[in-house]
Amino acid sequence: MPARRYKPTSPGRRNSSVLTRDSVTKEKPEKSLLAKLHKTGGRNVHGRITTRHKGGGHKRRYRIIDFKRNKDGVPATVAAIEYDPNRSANIALLHYHDGEKRYILAPRNLTVGSVVMSGPEAEVDVGNALPLANIPVGTTVHAVELEPGRGAQLARSAGTSAQIIAREGNLVTLRLPSGERRRVRAECRATVGVVGNQSHQNVRWGKAGRKRHLGIRPTVRGTVMNPVDHPHGGGEGKSTPGRAPVTPWGKITQGKPTRKKRKRSDAMIVARRKKGRRR
């Protein structure tokens, strides 16, 4: 699914690219697996902005994804690979042999007609979901649970994966996409393989309008605001903030750790993620 560059017929097209979606085999989603999706504009129930730079965008319907993969022992055939506007990865429509239909994240090299299965007895093949205790060390997995039965929470974005690097007792050590090494209970489930649509990171949006279609609003620098709006604001012309970089609420930013101290999950983290810019 490579990215296609446009000819520079306009300033917006000059620096833009799109995914070809060669692997997408079905355009219309399965109606029984759709749900309403209400936009919040980044506001909470009181109407206050809790997440900045969100709002607008094309209307969407949510695709109900099976992150638990708890239908054990029943084979399922991949009926289609579909586009999902709510995530960077594509999704696969499964037709179980008992008649049920479900969506899962589409791993790389999973094609229409492939047969997948979930459960402790499943083989270690691409698209199969099974407990980490039954997956060999060194295997690449995605859609990993943090707690048994809670559903996949790790390595769900396009092109991401985690690797099993050790097993000790009831705990399995994973190397996550960020570089963090973390222990997870062996009963937690994971799906074998790498999340597909890895070319998503190569897309160049080209113009602001394409980001607005995604529901992403502009990010304004604090130094061009008024003093009432940001600690960096005000001054005559282009002026320096005169202080260390801070958030709009005055908290130190650009490198200061924001993780809470003494979290319960600290005991499960072997090594924190690599510092610096991540892609």
UniProtKB/Swiss-Prot annotation:
The GO biological-process annotations, alphabetized, read as: cytoplasmic translation
SUPFAM superfamilies, alphabetized: Nucleic acid-binding proteins, Translation proteins SH3-like domain
According to the UniProt record, one GO cellular component term is: large ribosomal subunit
Known Pfam families for this protein? Ribosomal_L2, Ribosomal_L2_C
Q: Where is the composition biased (Polar residues)?
A: 12-22
Q: Where is this region: Disordered?
A: 1-28, 221-279
**Which Gene Ontology MF annotations are present?**
rRNA binding; structural constituent of ribosome; transferase activity
Described function: One of the primary rRNA binding proteins. Required for association of the 30S and 50S subunits to form the 70S ribosome, for tRNA binding and peptide bond formation. It has been suggested to have peptidyltransferase activity; this is somewhat controversial. Makes several contacts with the 16S rRNA in the 70S ribosome.
The subunit field of the Swiss-Prot or TrEMBL record says:
Part of the 50S ribosomal subunit. Forms a bridge to the 30S subunit in the 70S ribosome.
Annotated family: Belongs to the universal ribosomal protein uL2 family.
UniProt protein name: Large ribosomal subunit protein uL2
